[in-house]
Amino acid sequence: MTPTVHTWPILETARTQVLEQGIGLTEDQLVEVLQLPDEALPQALELAHQVRLRHCGEDVEVEGIVSIKTGGCPEDCHFCSQSGLFDSPVRGVWLDIPELVKAAKETAATGATEFCIVAAVRGPDIKLMNQVKFAIGRINEEVDINIACSLGMLTQQQVDQLAGWGVHRYNHNLETARSFFPQVVTTHTYEERLETCAMVKAAGMELCCGALLGMGESLHQRAELAAQLAALEPHEVPLNFLNPRPGTPLENQGLMDGKDALRAIAAFRLAMPRTVLRYAGGRELTLGDLGTREGLLGGINAVIVGNYLTTLGRPATADLSLLVDLNMPIRELQKTL
């Protein structure tokens, strides 16, 4: 006798609405996904994977990141060891142009198509903008790779400059839900982040705008964030999981439960069926090797390889080998410069 397979109404709804019609789940529907019991998780991940394959394709985008300026940031993002306001071991460091070119070459050698230049700042000053301009020029001369930037909040003039220099994609994360944001950042507002995101999109750059999960937000706030990101329609959403850093206000926050993280991955994919959903920081601790594999079979279709800004990531070879094992091709470079 064939055992009966239990089905959950929200997953049946998602199959019709998201998989077949390509319409993302609403905030209330996402809460239902995030509240699914553990026994429903395999079905949720399988459905999210089917959505990814149908609406995004089978290939996986690989990216590397490097920090041009580390530490000394004047903002008080409670999760970040680069804030100059906290007693963190991270100290201010600048990379010179040859080091950036070297990092871009190493990133390209992994098969990555995207290289992101990141700075720990509220927003870039003239010195930083000049450094970025020269770095972009040198990298374009020597490396065949798309260049992205993450330099904090921008003015319209800075947005226009970056677009003019050929920046392919700009990262500016919402991090968390609007309702939870004041509990983790007080030195700038949610609206200021949204303003930069809107200018980036209007200038024709691809917007990368993501989440940092596991900071103490509720399931409803995770759903709120996913819905807010879906409304923003970014090209890419990186999913970070809190890795509590010494000296920060969140240093004693426990790690997010791995199954909750996988539920979130499925939910974000069901909210945004056509968006690039990228594994970013913290997955090594929150999910480990097995969880990383499950996420790639549960909606993820992009990865950051190598190390992050102030923490160690999985070796690039481990992620690339996993993609081979899963028979997932790496997305080929399509230069936009």
Swiss-Prot record:
SUPFAM superfamilies registered for this protein in UniProt:
Radical SAM enzymes
Pathway(s) it belongs to:
Cofactor biosynthesis; biotin biosynthesis; biotin from 7,8-diaminononanoate: step 2/2
Keywords on this record? 2Fe-2S, 4Fe-4S, Biotin biosynthesis, Iron, Iron-sulfur, Metal-binding, S-adenosyl-L-methionine, Transferase
The Radical SAM core domain covers which part of the protein? Answer: 58-283
**Sites where the protein binds [2Fe-2S] cluster:** C116, C149, C208, R278
Name any one GO molecular function: biotin synthase activity
Q: Which Pfam families match?
A: BATS (PF06968), Radical_SAM (PF04055)
Catalytic activity, as annotated? (4R,5S)-dethiobiotin + (sulfur carrier)-SH + 2 reduced [2Fe-2S]-[ferredoxin] + 2 S-adenosyl-L-methionine = (sulfur carrier)-H + biotin + 2 5'-deoxyadenosine + 2 L-methionine + 2 oxidized [2Fe-2S]-[ferredoxin]
Quaternary data: Homodimer.
In Swiss-Prot or TrEMBL terms, this protein is called: Biotin synthase
